[in-house]
C-alpha cells in the first residue's frame, strides 16, 4: 500500500477524532468507524491482489466476496455524500480542510478498490 495513503488515512482519522460537532458527534464517530473499516478492507484487497493466487482462498473464505465488494462501494458512496454534506454546512476552516481531504481520499480509495477488484475478477 502507498505510504501516502496510509498517512492520509491516519491524518484524516486523527483530525476527525479531534472534531466535536455537537449533537452530531455520534454521526462523526460512525464516519470514523466506517473510514477505519474501509481502510482495513482496502488493505486486505490490495494484499490479495499482490498475492494473486490468493483470489481462490478469498473466494473460498468468503463465497459472497462480490456482494461484499458491492456493499463497500455503497459505503463509499454514503461516506462521500456524508462528507459533502458536512463540507457544505461547516463554517470552520479546520473542518472544511479536513472534510475536503477526506473527500479526496475517498475518491482515491474508491478508484484503488475498483482497480483491485478488476484485477481479482
Swiss-Prot record:
| UniProt xrefs under Gene3D superfamilies | 1.10.287.230, S15/NS1, RNA-binding
Q: Which organism is it from?
A: Influenza A virus (strain A/England/878/1969 H3N2)
Q: Where in the cell is it found?
A: Virion; Host nucleus
Sorted keywords for this record are: Host nucleus, Host-virus interaction, Transport, Virion
Give the protein's recorded name. Answer: Nuclear export protein
Pfam families the record matches: Flu_NS2
Return the motif ranges for Nuclear export signal. Answer: 12-21, 85-94
Example of a GO cellular component annotation carried by this entry: virion component
Q: Which domain of life is it from?
A: Viruses
Predominant location category: virion
A GO BP entry: exit of virus from host cell nucleus through nuclear pore
Q: Which family does it belong to?
A: Belongs to the influenza viruses NEP family.
Q: What does this protein do?
A: Mediates the nuclear export of encapsidated genomic RNAs (ribonucleoproteins, RNPs). Acts as an adapter between viral RNPs complexes and the nuclear export machinery of the cell. Possesses no intrinsic RNA-binding activity, but includes a C-terminal M1-binding domain. This domain is believed to allow recognition of RNPs bound to the protein M1.
Q: Does the keyword Cell cycle apply?
A: no
The record, for InterPro entries, names:
Flu_NS2
Q: Which gene encodes it?
A: NS
Instruction: Give the quaternary structure.
Output: Interacts with protein M1. May interact with host nucleoporin RAB/HRB and exportin XPO1/CRM1.
Q: What HAMAP family does the record point to?
A: INFV_NEP
